[in-house]
Structures are given as C-alpha cells and as structure tokens.
C-alpha cells in the first residue's frame, strides 16, 4: 500500500528495472527453532539464520516485494517465482546474478511477459552454457531457440542431436511447464525458450556471460553490460538495510517477532528512500552528479517520525547532506574488525 502511494513509475526504455537477490540474516540464537538453526558450518559457531529474498526497484531504490525464509527451508528460485506471480507490474526487466540460473526461472519469466538478464556460469561450470555449442571467440551475442522436453522418442531423438535446438531434462530437474508422468502414445510436450546468450568483456582478462530475452536490435552488448552493473544497487541496499537502518539489531528471539522486525526494517528503508526521492536537489554545474546520503537521511526520517523535527526542517537537512556519484569505481573487499552497535545509535 505504501509502495503504491509513492510509486513514481520510473522506467528505462519502457521497462521497470527490477533486481532480485538474496541475503543471509544472522538472528539471535534460538536452538529451539530448528528450521533456522545452523548447527555447524566451517569457521562458524552454531547460530540461527534467516534468508531475505528481495525484489528491488533499481530506479526508485526501494523494495517492491520480499520473502523471508529460514535457513533450512530457503529456496531462492521458489521465492523469485512467487514474487513474479504476485507482482502487479506487467512490463518489467529483472536482473539476477548466477544464483538464479535455471531453465525453470527463465520459463516463468518468459511466460509472465517479463524481460530478464541473468548472469550464467562459464562453460565448464555445469550451467546452461555447458549444453550449448557456442562460438569459439572471447565475445559473442548468440541467439538460441531451445525446446525443452522430458521425452526421448522418435519425435525428439533427432532434434536432441542438435544441442542448440533441443534439450532433454530428467524428472528430477524442476521444470513446471512439462509433465513428469505420461503414457505411451501421449503427445510429446515441448516448451520453447527464446533467448540470447551473450559474453561480454568487463575488464582486461575478465568476462561475464549472461542470458537475456531482450531484443538484440534494441539492446546491444554494451548496453547489457551497463544494465547488469545497475544490479549493484540491491547489494548497496542490503548494506543500508543491515547497518544503517539497523536490521541486525534484533529485540527478540522468537521467530515470529524476528520476522516482524525484518519487515519493519524493510518499511523503514523504503520510507527513508521515498522521502528522499521527494526532496529536490538544486541543479549546479559541478564535476559530478549528486545523490542524497542515505545514512544521514535515515536518521533524519527517524527524527521526523518521532516528531523531533518538522517536515520543512527535515527537507532542508536531507538536501544539505549529499554525496557525489562516481561511476565505474571498484575496490577489493577487505575484512575489518567489528564492534557491537550501541542501542542508542541504531536507526530502528
């Protein structure tokens, strides 16, 4: 309801840009909750863990949907499909990382009318690319019309000889659009996926491979590279959610209460972003474009909700705290020492 009220319907070439990803959440230890209890994992002590699956509007910078699962029952593919099916958006472009590489996910996206960009494993990684005959060059943009079947009979055996034309998948592989049981003489079921598999150079000696159903005439390789890089917004939002909004500082151990706190923090993140989006930044001729500093905005929005400052003062303060946008920067991740967070300094 809140999302609908603040929806600006921002689009890229007519598409709503959505990123889907998951993130682990360490919650207060509760050995009685066996579904979330991690008894042992290398270099880790026993703890409880939830998994947040989120759909994120890249242009508006807010979460449009979320599904929270427990450690032992987590299933990112199932969560993705559920979020697609209940989304009111009919013309979206969803961008996913390699964790969502599967024919079943591609089929659900194609059937829903959504476009997608999904990063896939390189040949040899036991992924989609392994079963295809791809060009022997460093970069390529290769169209594929692939029929999926669970049957091996006279009708399919000849087609299966061409791995770019037909693919057999056994019953143990999940694919919701083909029956697992059939009788002799039943017509052969086929489901055709239409996509491009693209390999792009991202830096010296580094390449990314992805599948997409975007039309080639409208979206060339370089544009796909730029679009995929925009997926990083959801990674940044997870950091904001955990360490600025304060999602990791739980008050309760009970699963239902922990779940409630997670959704409360998602709402707080969205409200901070919605209010920030309403603040108009003054146009200046500077070297960089500027964006509102989320860390400061979250504190200001909290004070606004508590009645400590007026809406006008909140707008002025948010407008004053901006950061330059410096694109194409990357740094290696360096682990740092971590201290506890005092309750006084948490946002929520």
Residue ranges and their predicted role:
Residues 1, 8-16, 20-33, 41-348:
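Single, function-defining residue in the core of a domain
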Residues 38:
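Extracytosolic and intramembrane catalytic regions of membrane-associated proteins
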């Amino acid at each position: 309801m809140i999302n609908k009220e603040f929806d600006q319907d921002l689009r890229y070439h007519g598409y709503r840009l959505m990123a889907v990803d998951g993130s682990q959440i360490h919650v207060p230890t509760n050995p009685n909750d066996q579904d979330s209890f991690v008894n042992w994992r290398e270099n880790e002590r026993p703890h409880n863990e939830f998994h947040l699956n989120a759909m994120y509007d890249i242009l508006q910078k807010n979460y449009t949907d979320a599904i929270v699962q427990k450690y032992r029952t987590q299933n990112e593919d199932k969560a993705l499909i559920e979020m697609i099916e209940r989304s009111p958006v009919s013309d979206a472009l969803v961008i996913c990382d390699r964790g969502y590489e599967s024919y079943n996910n591609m089929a659900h996206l194609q059937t829903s009318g959504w476009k997608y960009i999904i990063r896939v494993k390189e040949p040899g990684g036991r992924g989609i690319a392994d079963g295809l005959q791809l060009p022997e060059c460093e970069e390529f943009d290769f169209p594929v019309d692939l029929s999926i079947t669970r049957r091996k009979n006279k009708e399919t055996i000849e087609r299966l000889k061409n791995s770019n034309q037909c693919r057999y998948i056994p019953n143990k592989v999940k694919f919701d659009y083909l029956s697992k049981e059939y009788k002799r003489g039943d017509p052969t079921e086929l489901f055709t996926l239409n996509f491009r598999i693209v390999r792009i150079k991202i830096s010296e000696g580094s390449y990314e491979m992805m599948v997409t159903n975007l039309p080639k005439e409208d979206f060339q390789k370089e544009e796909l590279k730029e679009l995929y890089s925009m997926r990083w917004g959801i990674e940044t939002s997870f950091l904001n959610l955990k360490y600025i909004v304060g999602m990791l500082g739980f008050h309760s151990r009970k699963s239902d209460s922990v779940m409630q706190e997670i959704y409360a923090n998602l709402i707080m993140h969205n409200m901070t972003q919605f209010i920030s989006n309403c603040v108009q930044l003054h146009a200046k001729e500077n070297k960089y474009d500027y964006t509102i500093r989320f860390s400061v905005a979250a504190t200001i929005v909290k004070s606004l909700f508590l009645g400590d400052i007026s809406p006008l003062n909140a707008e002025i303060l948010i407008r004053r705290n901006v950061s330059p946008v410096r694109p194409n920067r990357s740094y290696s991740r360096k682990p740092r020492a971590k201290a506890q967070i005092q309750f006084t300094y948490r946002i929520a």
